[in-house]
């Protein structure tokens, strides 16, 4: 799988150079990078972080893009950032109105720094669910 992901990186980078504001291209590149970064190690930590940066860029362009949050949870999980991975899953499930959003939001809130953007978003998710 990593070999296929490696082959996808360069074409996505070329496409993004032509269309930098295309969320689906950013998500596709991030997905390839996350597959490459799944092997672990210090070098792959940087690859995973780069993937998360692309996903954040995609979400700035399309804040309700569920697949971006799903990929982000994978990236944060690979980095060992479990609370952030749970937050991303809460966002993913909340966007679809799925009841799993509550469980992931509750897990996230325990580990996120109070006052962080992700903490505030998680509180918002829980508030919306409780209504």
Which ranges hold each PLM region?
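Helix-start (N-cap) detector for alpha-helical repeat units in TPR-like alpha-solenoids
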Residues: 23-24, 66-67, 83, 99, ...
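Terminal, low-structured helical/coil segments at or just beyond the last alpha-helical repeat
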Residues: 78, 94-131
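Canonical positions in the second alpha-helix
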Residues: 15, 57-58, 91-92, 108
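Structural motif corresponding to the intra-repeat A-B loop/turn of tetratricopeptide repeats
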Residues: 2, 36, 45, 79-80, ...
């Amino acid at each position: 799988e990593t070999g296929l992901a490696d082959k996808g990186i360069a074409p996505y980078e070329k496409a993004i150079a032509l269309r930098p504001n295309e969320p689906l291209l950013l998500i596709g590149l991030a997905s390839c990078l996350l597959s490459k970064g799944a092997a672990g190690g210090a070098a792959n930590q940087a690859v995973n972080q780069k993937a998360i940066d692309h996903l954040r860029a995609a979400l700035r362009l399309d804040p309700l893009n569920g697949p971006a949050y799903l990929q982000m949870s994978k990236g944060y999980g690979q980095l060992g950032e479990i609370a952030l991975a749970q937050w991303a899953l809460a966002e993913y499930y909340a966007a679809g109105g799925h009841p799993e959003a509550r469980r992931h939001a509750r897990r996230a809130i325990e580990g996120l720094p109070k006052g962080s953007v992700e903490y505030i978003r998680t509180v918002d998710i829980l508030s919306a669910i409780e209504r």
